[in-house]
Amino acid sequence: NIQECLKGADILMVVVPAIAHRFIAQTCAPYLKEHQIVVLNPGRTGGALEFFNALKQHGLRRFPFIAEAQTFLYASRALGPAHAKIFSIKNTVPLATLPAYWIPGVLKVINRAFPQFIPGDNIFKTSFENIGAVFHPALTILNAGWIEETHGDFEYYIQGTSDSVAQILEKLDKERLEIAAALGIKVMSAKAWLYTAYSATGKDLREAINANPGYSGIKAPDRLHHRYVDEDVPMSLVPLASLGKMLKVETPTINAIIHLASVMRGIDFWEKGRTVEKLGIKGMSIKEIRLLAVTGEL
């Protein structure tokens, strides 16, 4: 009973695949109160904006505090019903709110339980620093044969990131950085993120991945019908590519991964994904998008 769950709650930690964010927003909308804090763990790309739009479409005029985490705090795996293994806890995870001026107040409350959360500049920065967009879809698709043959019986990050695969990840990462730069937002490279989140260093991305003890022992997905594709393609790569197209930033590598994922899964991820139309920012200028992040007003 969602009404009973929300009654008396001050903080709502939403820990579901991003494909469920809109459903959660629609389900909770009739019962949410202004004082409550909703944290998407994580938002992926555009999570807070999609959640806000879903509440607005439901008729809300007074909103709870909506926040999104840049990534999930834990490097973990579900091992069975009510059974999970935490491989590592990240050093820090940026968190941003819509609008951005809520960040200090929300963090003051959240940090009492989770000191790892730190201020993110705004929801577009946390969305662009969604490193799952870089690692998950491409790494899964490029290791599809190995995953299907072994049912994921290999170390996903350590063994899955060969020299050639790492080159593709770095190119995809470069396109992500270029889209952010077009909006005037400076974001970390995937290699820099590995150092910030896990203190892992290396001369290139592959070396940094191999140097991360938090990835040691993490197995690959046992099938391709997995959130690394079904969540991260439509909720991470599609919004990046869609925004890139609007800003006239070329994204051939991102587009290629979206296309391959769509063919492989028999799903039109462009249709299912978070496009600029669905996020309510189609046709907006760079100034208007940046103002939206600060004020929360469309």
Residue ranges and their predicted role:
Residues 18-80:
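Rossmann-like NAD(P)(H) cofactor-binding subdomain of soluble oxidoreductases
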Residues 80-155, 159-193:
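Internal alpha-helical scaffold of NAD(P)-dependent oxidoreductase catalytic cores
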Residues 1-9:
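A structured beta-alpha segment of the ubiquitous adenosine-cofactor-binding alpha/beta core
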Residues 10-11, 37:
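Structural motif
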Residues 8, 15-17, 41, 113:
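Short, well-ordered coil/turn residues at beta-beta hairpins
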Residues 166-298:
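NAD(P)-dependent Rossmann-like dehydrogenase/reductase catalytic/cofactor-binding core
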